[in-house]
Amino acid sequence: MELIRVLANLLILQLSYAQKSSELVFGGDECNINEHRSLVVLFNSNGFLCGGTLINQDWVVTAAHCDSNNFQLLFGVHSKKILNEDEQTRDPKEKFFCPNRKKDDEVDKDIMLIKLDSSVSNSEHIAPLSLPSSPPSVGSVCRIMGWGKTIPTKEIYPDVPHCANINILDHAVCRTAYSWRQVANTTLCAGILQGGRDTCHFDSGGPLICNGIFQGIVSWGGHPCGQPGEPGVYTKVFDYLDWIKSIIAGNKDATCPP
């Protein structure tokens, strides 16, 4: 019954959330059912909130701006309408944010580390994603995925996650595209310069995967998504490795890069 309630909640996508900076995969195709085993759904009583990434059996990484009251995490889901037998639901036991994060900028140091209330079991549709040992290079082909909008200007959301390939771009591209705001050095600029493929509403918090490695967290981008010359901005996981490892090791006073 619990999973039935979960799926019912996921189908109730409140339009009020569509104005947030959360994003969805536009220009992609249905993901292979086994290629997103680390992809996590964050949801509450209002419905779908964000994506996230399982990094081990007890910890999930998502975007800080995805934080909400009383959310849960769902693992192993592919279709919102058809259950996988190995789907698992967990509550957050603890949530960790960068202590030096700017409170008036929801995408500053846009990373949240979640400790689960109990361990998740690996299964056919559930497995953690490896953290990086180095950042991706410009030109790398990376994978985005999520249940976000498939048409940027309409409230149309898929029943299954969509995936697409995009490229790591020079950081100067995003600085030029978004000259009206600061684009932090601790982010990755990624997309297709001519447009047409991008993360979009409700993809926020999900992974940017390069060569099978967890390299980025969906943070923010242009509106509508997928426009030429307006790539996505992703939190660079590599820059937060020390913070992530310190928190997991029990050092709750760990600080993030400036």
From Swiss-Prot:
Endpoints of the signal sequence: 1-18
GO CC terms of this entry: extracellular region; secretory granule
Residue positions assigned to the propeptide: 19-24
Keywords of the record: Disulfide bond, Fibrinolytic toxin, Glycoprotein, Hemostasis impairing toxin, Hydrolase, Plasminogen activation, Protease, Secreted, Serine protease, Signal, Toxin, Zymogen
Annotated EC: 3.4.21.-
Entry function: Snake venom serine protease that activates plasminogen.
Protein name: Venom plasminogen activator TSV-PA
Organism: Trimeresurus stejnegeri
Lineage: Eukaryota, Metazoa, Chordata, Craniata, Vertebrata
